Structures are given as C-alpha cells and as structure tokens.
Amino acid sequence: TLLRFLAPQLNNYKDKILIIDPDIFALKDPKKIIEDHRNTSDLSCVFYNNNPRSEMMLVDAARVKWNFKNIISKLFNFEIDYEDLMNLKFNLNLNINKIGKCYNSHDKIQDDTILLHTTNRITQPWKEGLEINFFKHNLSKFQIFKEHVKKIIGISHNKELISKTFLKHPNKDVENSIKNLFKEAKRLNYFNQKDIEKEIANFNISKKIFE
C-alpha cells in the first residue's frame, strides 16, 4: 500500500505514472485518463465521500516530489496520520484533479466502467473458498458471538463477520468479469498451467477462478 508513494521517485520524477492497487482490473483501455487529466494538476484521482482516493492515481512525477524515505519516517514517528496519507491530506499543497468513478469503480460494473476495484477483501473472486489469511479489524467478541447465534437460530446474519473462508462476490457481473480476465491472461500466455498449479498450492488463488 505504501509503495504507491515511491513511484515518482522510482521513475526519477519524470513522466505521468498510472498507479493502481493490485486488486484493480482494467475492463477497458485506461488511456483516456490522460485526456481527463489537467496539465496544471499534480495528480488525478477519484473521490469518495469527498475524499481523494490514492489507490488509483495518475501522477505527474515531474510535479510531485514525494520523498519516500521521508514519508515513511514521518509516518512511523506519528508526524503523518495514516488515513491522511491514504487520503492525500498529508500534503495540502497538492493540486488534485477530480475524475469520474469509472476509473475506480468499487465492486460494481456500469457501462462506462474502465477500472474495477474489488475493495472488499473477503469477496475477491480469485480467493473464493480459501481460508481467510488476514485479520478482521475492529470486531468485538460480542459482535462475532451475536452473528453466530443468529446463524444457529436461522435468521439473517452477516456472513462476512464470521466466515473463515473467502466468500463468493455478491455481484455476478464482477465475478464473471474477473474470471474472464484470468482466463484471457492464461490464453495469452501471461502465465501457464504450471504457474496456476503453483499459486493454487500456495493458496494464493482458488481453482474456482478458472471454472
């Protein structure tokens, strides 16, 4: 997550750089983002709840002089708040260009969706059925107990809170689109069957993604 702030420095502060999280998928060619970027802006990104989101950014590296070592140092010395960093509020001098949600669509596909972001970790389609390998934050024992009781007595409950395995994505279009991307990548030899078997054996992907 933090490595996104290394990109301008890594590219010697040159060119425009598209930075995306690994759980973002291109459903269409994202090159139009160049046209939607204002050359007077430091970066372009999507806003949610009036906050700029840093998981997908087009950064003008010639204008954005982030020093990764300094950022990390300030973060661990509590000089920068983590949420402020993620929401790009750590630098109030940034000139941010707001672009459409089609470039960072959270778990839904619309006609204009270009970049699909699978934000809910427990329903990421390539993990379906595997044991959860992350810690669920901000959950009390009472919350978990309450959901288990609801399940036992057969009433509606929050599966995400108590599931020990990754769940099926609730949006069939999202699930099918990502499955098709995996199959297309295999067909185009970006990886082979041996690679797939290795990642399945290491519990990095579920075999269900190729069904």
Residue ranges: model-predicted function:
Residues L3-N49, M57-V64:
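GT-A fold catalytic core of metal-dependent nucleotide-sugar glycosyltransferases
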Residues N51-P52, D111:
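Short, solvent-exposed loop/turn segments at the edges of secondary structure
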Residues P52-S54, L94:
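Short edge beta-strand segments in beta-sheet-rich domains
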Residues S54-M56, I114:
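Small-molecule pocket liners
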Residues M56-M57, M86:
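Detector for methionine-enriched segments
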Residues K65-E211:
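A glycosyltransferase accessory/donor-loop signature
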